Amino acid sequence: MVDISIVIVNYKSWNDLKDCLQSIITINSSKFTLETIVVDNQSNDGRLEEFKTLFPSILFLENSGNNGFANGCNLGASNAKGNYLFFLNPDTIINKDAVLKLWKTTYKNPDYGIVSCLQTDESNNKYTEIRFFPKLSTLFGLSRVLYRFLNYFSLRKKFNFHKEKVFPDWVTGATIFMSREWFNTVNGWTEKYWLYFEDVDLCKKTQEKNGKICLIRTANIFHKHGGATRINIKTKALTKTEVLISKHVFVSEHKSGFNKHLIQSLLILSLLFEKCLLAITGIVFFFIPKLKVNIYIFKNLINYYRNAISKKTWISPRSVKYLQK
């Protein structure tokens, strides 16, 4: 039996993936055994066979389509042999120390459903640690600022920089370490999300089963954010639209009654208003790519809401669970 199975979902991120895999194969430890599984979400660019030759010790699986991050993670986990699962982005570079600390922390604390660590980018900036589950007080920009202000002292105490471990509501899916037992307890990743918020959902399900979400500050990995989702303007608009769609899916999954309908309604109104203004700005300043992308986001959002009304579902048409009973 393997101790740790690393699962990576890839979509045309071959250059980043190569660096990631090279960092993995250099890890040699007598304290744990590793296997690595790469699920390619049908990149269809001829690189998969090349990588199979470059990295013969790694298991490469080709998915049936670009089925999303959650579906790819579940496919990788279903082929994994490890007692522990380490879900990793292809645009990360890891080290033995981080893997060992993640494994030890998870092993010694069976009530920790999910464990993650610090992440730094190319400029050595740390990714945020303070993350909240979406609710009325945290889902919108202004309400989130007010929430942080009103809870300043409690948040400062909870995330005190002297602490080696902190417990946010959720951690990013770029680095998620969990036992096989916990993965099975929460029934894996929810495939209703095509991209984004599946990590928020996984952490929410874990907390609902009384599992803790832990971030250890004594370990660190490099994470080049947005490696697979910022290829061009239309791709960037697509992925940013999916963030908004996934917010609706999360609310649909985890809220109920009047509260659910209220949040969904407010979310629709706020997003349409914001994206309409940004789209107008993008039309006026069409020569600025960062602004022009907002035109495509607004179009995508209108099409999504039309489809959501006609099909009576919040799920993205790109999800493998779209229109499934």
Over which residues does each language-model region extend?
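Short, well-formed alpha-helical segments that are part of the catalytic scaffolds
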Residues: S13-T26
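A conserved acidic beta->alpha catalytic loop
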Residues: S23, D40-L48, G65
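Glycine-rich, basic loop-to-helix element that forms the pyrophosphate-binding segment
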Residues: E62-A80
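Short aromatic/hydrophobic "clamp" motif used to bind/position activated sugar donors
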Residues: L85
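Conserved donor NDP-sugar-binding/catalytic core segment of glycosyltransferases
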Residues: K96-I130
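Short, flexible, basic/aromatic active-site loop/helix in glycosyltransferases
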Residues: K135-P168
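A short, conserved alpha-helix in the catalytic core of glycosyltransferases
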Residues: K163, D169-N220
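Active-site-adjacent helix/loop segment of glycosyltransferases
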Residues: E208, K212-P289, V293
